Amino acid sequence: MPELPEVETIMRGISPFLEGATIKKIKLNRADLRWPFPENFASRVREAKVLNLKRRSKYILVDLSTGETLLIHLGMSGKILVSGSKIGNYFYESSKRSYHDHVIFELNDGTKITYNDPRRFGAMDLAKTNDVNNHKFLEKLGPEPLGNNFNTDYLKT
């Protein structure tokens, strides 16, 4: 299972490709991951501009221009692959789709962001950006270990 530092590294690695990009197409190669995708998932994400990425615990949060945030959890074996772009060292070349490529986002510049998860323990959901911290995945999480609220005063309580 990707631990918090790896999720942070993945989030930072895909940010240059996603931030400012528009999701032109989305292909769901199955109806669910660990849980079913939210209702109208593809149409709610399609044509949205990616405003920014952040991490909360082991979740990657993708703020969209639609006022919603895409929550991504990698589960035990999930990974995010970037293809069709020559920027950075994240280029992934494959002539055919892997059986475990469950979600493919195609961006306005032709870059493809592929969520691959052999065990399907990962998850994707959408939440209102202004209420994302009350989402069922996030509402009971403790303070962020890299944040200012995780300090000696918190540890004393």
Task: State where each predicted segment sits.
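Extended, highly charged segments
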Residues: 1-68, 85-87, 106, 111
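Phosphate/anion-contacting hairpin/loop surfaces
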Residues: 70-157
